[in-house]
């Protein structure tokens, strides 16, 4: 719960309250919009966010009567360009991820991929991860 998170972090507020992979049917009621707005008014969250794969995100974009979320995080790859769902719906690429795993499957140089990603999502945040220390050092140089 948010209260436990705030307590554990010894904070009064989090910047982004992110829901990961929720089902649209569970969040499509007005109560969620009211709940999130109240958290903002109480100063407990600054922004609300939604992290989904592109297929599930479409339900939220097409069916939501109110703007439930300020920030959208969606998987993306250079070959499939899943995040184009945002662009087609006049929404910015804010937080994208999944590039390196898709590049690894295809045997593509990850540094070259990262340079292209920075062009694709030049105003948002790009999440990359690796448990290889050398890759992390290289990624930090791009």
Where are the predicted features?
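Short amphipathic alpha-helices and their capping/turn segments at secondary-structure boundaries
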Residues: 1-8, 84-89
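Active-site groove signature of glycoside hydrolases
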Residues: 6-27
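Beta/alpha (TIM)-barrel catalytic core signal, keyed to glycine-rich beta->alpha loops juxtaposed to Asp/Glu
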Residues: 20-142
